[in-house]
Amino acid sequence: MPTINQLIRKPRQAPVEKSKVPALKACPQRRGVCTRVYTTTPKKPNSALRKVCKVKLTSGFEVISYIGGEGHNLQEHSVVLVRGGRVKDLPGVRYHTVRGSLDTAGVKDRKQSRSKYGAKRPKKA
């Protein structure tokens, strides 16, 4: 236990918080170019083919980004917007691609949670 005088000379250091999304360099999103678009399988006990892409960001990092929603139009050299947010059952995937922005199309025929998938409001019949 330090004395008051010791604390006056050298105050307590607050622990430094490590960023969960270092490639974004303290920005909300970053633009990048897809270098590879592929599917991968999740950890146990889940089973699926999750759509992901390797993205070279403007910050210089190359990261793996998850493509949410049903169906996508991404291929190599597509320009995408990447936000933070990990995918719990995919190790190493700490970013999400933003749907409906830059070269990424929104999810077709999406009725609920549209803003998360870049889907426009459907026309009234």
Curated annotation (Swiss-Prot):
Transmembrane segments: none annotated. Residues 113-125 have a biased composition (Basic residues). InterPro entries: NA-bd_OB-fold, Ribosomal_uS12, Ribosomal_uS12_bac. One of its GO terms (biological process) is translation. The modification 3-methylthioaspartic acid is found at residue 89. It comes from the Bacteria. One of its GO terms (cellular component) is small ribosomal subunit. Keywords: Methylation, Ribonucleoprotein, Ribosomal protein, RNA-binding, rRNA-binding, tRNA-binding. Residues 101-125 are annotated as: Disordered. GO terms for molecular function: rRNA binding; structural constituent of ribosome; tRNA binding. CDD domains: Ribosomal_S12. Part of the 30S ribosomal subunit. Contacts proteins S8 and S17. May interact with IF1 in the 30S initiation complex. Belongs to the universal ribosomal protein uS12 family. HAMAP family: Ribosomal_uS12_B. With S4 and S5 plays an important role in translational accuracy. Interacts with and stabilizes bases of the 16S rRNA that are involved in tRNA selection in the A site and with the mRNA backbone. Located at the interface of the 30S and 50S subunits, it traverses the body of the 30S subunit contacting proteins on the other side and probably holding the rRNA structure together. The combined cluster of proteins S8, S12 and S17 appears to hold together the shoulder and platform of the 30S subunit. This is Small ribosomal subunit protein uS12. It comes from Thiobacillus denitrificans (strain ATCC 25259 / T1).
